[in-house]
A protein has these predicted regions:
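Outer-membrane beta-barrel "beta-signal"
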Residues: 78, 169-173, 185, 198-211
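Residues that define the transmembrane beta-barrel architecture of outer-membrane proteins
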Residues: 35-41, 68-72, 99-105, 129-135, ...
């Protein structure tokens, strides 16, 4: 649903800017002692639909023999004040016995300069508002002209508490094409937070294109 919304919205805004990344991904996960190792694809979409609306989406799809991995995260931010935004966030992970989906609504504080940016956000599950929470931060570092490092951390307090950490590096090869390197780790625990259910990581490499 989130992906469809983004594509429809992108078409609607003729002045939109988009950075699309397509990469080869290597997946390594463990569910209660059972290991899953395989490969697949990783899609990244980042852009601005209007001066007040920005979005970010990451999708991973892989296969481990006859088991399929689907992992996606996305957010849309609507700026209501210069540094304050309303955030619609969604995530999904499906692998073997683990199937978790979260849709949250919240607020964020955003501060950006030419070489540094930080976003701090917090929200609550739409279906259980005030019961389950999502919170985290995202930092953008302009290492040098034409290169950028993004670090992010997110915790989703739901039926299975999920913690995600990401590191993504983009190096511009030309005006429109860039090298895309990334690492993402995911860990989910049971409802009590006492035992790890899923733990693993995704490493990917590919290219980005700016429209």
């Amino acid at each position: 649903i989130l992906l469809a919304f983004l594509f429809c919205a992108t078409t609607a805004f003729s002045q939109s800017s988009i950075s699309a990344g397509l990469s080869y991904g290597s997946f390594n996960y463990d569910i209660s002692g059972t290991k899953y190792t395989g490969d697949g694809g990783v899609l990244n979409l980042d852009g601005q639909l209007s001066p007040a609306i920005t979005y970010s989406l990451s999708m991973s799809d892989g296969k481990f023999d006859d088991v399929v991995l689907n992992n996606s995260e996305g957010s849309i931010t609507y700026s209501v004040f210069p540094n304050i935004g309303i955030d619609f966030m969604g995530s999904q992970i499906k692998l073997a016995t683990v199937q978790e989906t979260d849709t949250s609504l919240g607020i964020s504080y955003n501060l950006y300069t030419s070489s540094f940016g930080i976003k701090v956000f917090a929200g609550s599950d739409i279906n259980n508002y005030g019961k389950f929470y999502t919170y985290g931060t995202k930092v953008n570092l302009g290492i040098s002209q034409g290169s950028n490092l993004t670090l992010s951390y997110k915790t989703e307090d739901r039926k299975q508490k999920a913690t995600t950490m990401d590191a993504r590096f983009i190096y511009d090869l030309t005006t429109n094409i860039g090298l895309n390197l990334g690492y993402k780790s995911t860990e989910t625990k049971n409802a009590a937070g006492t035992a790890i259910v899923l733990k693993g990581n995704t490493t990917y490499a590919g290219f980005t294109y700016k429209f």
